Amino acid sequence: MGRTAVVTGASSGIGKATAAALVTRGYRVIGTSRKPEGIEPDAQVPGVEYRALDLTDNASIAAFVAGLGEVDLLVNNAGESQAGPLAELPTDAVERLFRLNVLGPIALTQAVLPGMRERRYGRVVMVGSMIASFPMPYRSSYGATKAALKGFAVAARFEESPFGVWLTTVEPGQINTGLRERRTKYLDEGSPHTADFTRFIAKLDEAQGKGITADKVADTIVRAIEADRPQPLYAVGSNAPIMFGVRRLLPRTVLERLIARVHGLSR
């Protein structure tokens, strides 16, 4: 196809699966990792050009962008998962989460948009989460970052689509990529939320262990990229069509009780 794609967080999970899918379809793929030299040879995707990028570091973003050249597709996938009661989340941890999950991807998007407009073609995919559409307890900071990404993408579609540049969001539901092992958790010693939080995390881990594969999400990302007019939102996994239908039909208070019950919480 001759098009160049950038996939952030390409060393594992959704990013790795997306990079592999795009290489198979003939794209030139630049995959990012904070430490690409640490990716074992047998964990690398053949055909992917790995480059260093730390989305929390403005200097790293600037250095990465300076060496890019033309980019036709950007998949903003890199991010961190975080959990904890709002009252006990360290401010510096929340700030870092927003730098990694929101501000870094937006800076990268701003860097590639002018070239896409000039060539009258571009695709930007924000890898979000269904938690942005269905907020969960103890996931306020993470859900807020994913809602912010979607908000940027939905609004910017109006600005960029006249130039042939389409922004879209892919929202996976529960996905089994090992992210639960890397999730950062914050809970004060003696917290009044301890029992509630412990039950919630156990239910969440169980659901994610039964979740869809990264390949399933990658297939949806590729479908969005290759659509003539990508939709604003693609949701995949966790019975997405049913869940979004239920959200339209049920009052918010009923939906809150349903989410609480599914995660072992009494409300």
What are these regions (language model features)?
Residues S129:
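Residue(s) in the substrate-gating loop at a strand-loop-helix junction
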Residues F134, A155-W166:
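Active-site-adjacent segment of SDR/Rossmann-fold oxidoreductases
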Residues P85-L86, A93-E95:
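Substrate-binding pocket helix/loop in short-chain dehydrogenase/reductase
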Residues S11-S12:
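Conserved glycine-rich cofactor-binding loop
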Residues N77-Q82:
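Conserved NAD(P)H cofactor-binding loop of Rossmann-fold oxidoreductase domains
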Residues T109, T145:
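Active-site helix of classical SDR
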